[in-house]
Amino acid sequence: MAKKRVADVLVDTLVAAGVKRVYGLVGDSLNGVTDSIRPRKDLQWVPVRHEETAAFAAGAEAQLTEQLTVCAGSCGPGNLHLINGLYDCHRSRVPVLAIAAQIPSEEIGSGYFQETHPEHLFAQCSHYCELISQPEQMPRILEIGIQTAIARRGVSVVALPGDVALRNAVEQEPRLHFPPPKPTVCPADDEIAALAKVLNDSEKITILAGAGCAGAHAELIALAGKLNAPIVHALRGKEFIEYDNPFDVGMTGLLGFSSGYFAMMNCNTLLMIGTDFPYQQFFPKHATVIQIDIRGEQLGRRTKLDYGLVGDTRVTLQALLPKLKQNGDDAHLKTSLEHYRKARKGLDELATEGSERKGSHPQFVARTMSELAREDAIFACDVGTPTIWASRYLKMNGKRRLLGSFVHGSMASALPQAIGAQMAMPNRQVITMSGDGGVSMLLGDLLTLHQLEQPVKVVVFRNDSLSFVE
């Protein structure tokens, strides 16, 4: 039997970690890795036209599946093109491993052709970034990178010189296993009791809920019912919060509704759950503010807190609900809902087809897309005006998903995220809401869709401008 090479061990380790696909663009320095993948039936190489597409696509797959996904780039400019997509993955907290090929190991530090230092370049957009310089480091360094990406929910980068990938591997037993993390952290009983007392004594409560409420829809609705509290949702929380929610009053912030802003600014107590909503100017100045988040480092970093609890949304609310009294005052809720009704009516009136217009205006297109899409469709929207139309006119139902560069705010994310979504979910309908500026940045990857024969529906909103910044 032929002796395994380092690249073979890399591929074996990825498969053991449950990886299904590697998104990337081939290059000489990646030949060892791609040659090792080629005969495999349990790992697919997904070719793209630009490495940034590979990173965005991997991030989308990781977000939808909650499983580790991999992208790869050749040495120097090749893997450097990954960086913008990796920033998005890291800030969105999805588990992605990047394989960054490196120049020949004996040339590192000599100013060689295409020389860069990935272990420095990717340090700010990763939890783990290391160079494998000799076969003895495999698979241990790769395993640590995988475990870190999964456990800390973010990016790991492993740099691998092309010549090292082709060397004979040193036989080593795998050390680590890769169970997906499912934290169920709950605050202490005395913290829950103190929070319940504050809420029971409060009037005019508003809930601001974000993506951290995923999987806790029933508990969140029950909480709002107990407190008679309107729910303002953050953009990333839309898909988890908005549907089947009689307490929802829309978003606040730059893309938000007047009703969401009203509910926030007119509350006496603001309860933030699973959100890192970034815009300080949209927080009330004189309300009591409470924040629940699984990540303790996020408590109080957007606005001054009176109470902060570290906990998983679902188990924390399950512990809290039995201790709450029914709030008998629904005046704040009713007023906020009336504001929402009026705001929603105004937005819906903008989404009607007008005979006086030439062509279809974007609000009408977005609403029509929502009406025609399948009940489990996956939408990927570009930043700028497509995100506005998505946030206001796409109807979520608990089955649909919404992808976008909502934290990093990068142009051109919709098309590559749709590629990753369709590869991961081949039986789901995937639709982009692309801006003409965004789609043009990575236009070459329309060829990727054609090559892969993926049925992504690419909808381009053309306004002949970068309208959100002009």
Tell what function each PLM region has.
Residues A7-L10, V15, L25-D28, T34-R40, ...:
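Active-site diphosphate/adenylate-binding microenvironment
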